[in-house]
Amino acid sequence: MKSKRFEIGLEQLQEIDGASGEKVIQTLEDIAPDLGEYIIEFAFGDIYSRQGLSLQEREVITITSLLTLGGCEPQLEVHINGSLNVGISPEKIIETFIQCIPYVGFPKVLNATFVAKKIFSERNLILGSNTNDGR
């Protein structure tokens, strides 16, 4: 029997990532099943289920953190999809990345943007051509 934290976490994960999140956990079953449980119980059961931030706000923070870390493209892919699933627009995702340029530099922002581009293409999402720079 799974813990209450696991049940809450799995519910949060399904709301954000649908079947994609569960697939990530399933890939760990044969090598590190406890790691999958930790992700569900701690990240989603304890952290994502807290009051005070919406799922949209949590996903913006998550994709920003993953961009900042760098080298997290698989996790960034999961959370960009999650961001879209909870109603964040592609434009807001890209604008969030652009905001990071002065703090983390072009290479990390470019890497994250290319992950987003792949996901947007897979989901047939088209961004507007407006640069939104006020010039």
Model-derived features: positions:
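C-terminal structural segments of small proteins and small subunits
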Residues: Y103-P107
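Residue-level marker of alpha-helix boundaries and capping positions
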Residues: L35, G70-G71
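Acidic, glycine/proline-rich low-complexity segments that act as flexible tails and inter-domain linkers
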Residues: M1-Q56, L110-R135
